[in-house]
Amino acid sequence: MAKIYFIAGEMSGDFIGGRIIQHLKNNTGVQFVGVGSKYMEEAGSFKSLFPISAINLIGFVEILPHILKLKKLIDKTVEDIINSKADLLITIDSPGFTYRVAKQVRKLLPKLKMIHIVAPSVWAYKEGRAIKYAKIYDCLFAVLPFESPYFTKVGLDCRYIGHPIMEQEFYSDKIALRKEFKIDENEKVLCVTLGSRRGEILRHLPVFIASIEEIFESCKNLKVIFTLVNPANEVIIKPFLENVKFNYLFSSERLKTYALSDLALAKSGTNTLEIAASGTPMIVAYKVNILSFLIIRALIKIKYVTLINIIAGSEIIPEFIQHNCRATLISNKLQELLFSSKKAYKQVIESQKILQKLRFKSNQLPSYIAAEIIKQEFLEPKIKL
């Protein structure tokens, strides 16, 4: 029986891993072990080596206080991979952790086959990372259509599989969803996404609340839904809402929330693709530690942070980044989209066109394409087909 060691450092990676495992375990004799969360554990019937929240870090500076803890987790993971006697190592995104693990494993197990899923954003900054990945990995699965040439030119086998956003099932019946959430017909719904990390939430929450307070003055029928990636984050957010004037509620059913909303105020990230795919207009705001920002600004080669804008080469979705992440600027744009259906509709239509570019040309699911490559090219001699 073949054995695959998976590593995912975030929930988005865990989702990808879980979907691939579901395809791999059909009609194959494969055992799964590694580091992941609910999707991978459930699909692969294994217990994660440790909770992925332990490695869910962000930023250049923010990671420094956790460097010793991170090193211990890297060493622990490397040791577990060696002891597992796995036939294949698959790492997913989270390059700050997964690359360091893979680099050590390559030194200790030079013959072990290794695949990485979700290419590092070398098109945005540090293009030299492509060479580093070529020295470590046997194959790379890219999720954006323009990424492969950056890696193939340095000798790394890179396959475009399509974006995982195409795996999601999105809701379209806004009326039914609003009834389910007990939203009145005359209410304007603004959904707010703050991310999953405590630091991100605390950094964005004050300016987001101030922005909402400003638009509430001209939109008394506003209802705000805070979407929770982790339900436990409600206790972080609630103290900030004690004296607000607007009505609000919490929801961990993010895809339903995106679909029923009139507008979204979103932290930059994968959530912006989900909101766009739900047919909801949005504004994106984001800021990081000032030292992290200075480092990023010196390295980065792109004008936008939202993937839809990056692919389009223009600002389809309004962005308010770092020093522009201010309540007055954000609230003005929120009001503009909330009360101008024409502008909101235009954003939705243009976003949908960009999303179609993330779909594999055969319309096959990314996880299915990935699983087929893994089975046929990396595991075939060891599994029962």
UniProtKB/Swiss-Prot annotation:
Condensation of UDP-2,3-diacylglucosamine and 2,3-diacylglucosamine-1-phosphate to form lipid A disaccharide, a precursor of lipid A, a phosphorylated glycolipid that anchors the lipopolysaccharide to the outer membrane of the cell. It catalyses: a lipid X + a UDP-2-N,3-O-bis[(3R)-3-hydroxyacyl]-alpha-D-glucosamine = a lipid A disaccharide + UDP + H(+). Its EC number is 2.4.1.182. HAMAP family: LpxB (MF_00392). PANTHER family: LIPID-A-DISACCHARIDE SYNTHASE (PTHR30372), LIPID-A-DISACCHARIDE SYNTHASE, MITOCHONDRIAL-RELATED (PTHR30372:SF4). GO terms for cellular component: membrane. This is Lipid-A-disaccharide synthase. Pathway: Bacterial outer membrane biogenesis; LPS lipid A biosynthesis. The lineage of its organism: Bacteria, Pseudomonadati, Pseudomonadota, Alphaproteobacteria, Rickettsiales. Disulfide bonds: none annotated. Belongs to the LpxB family.
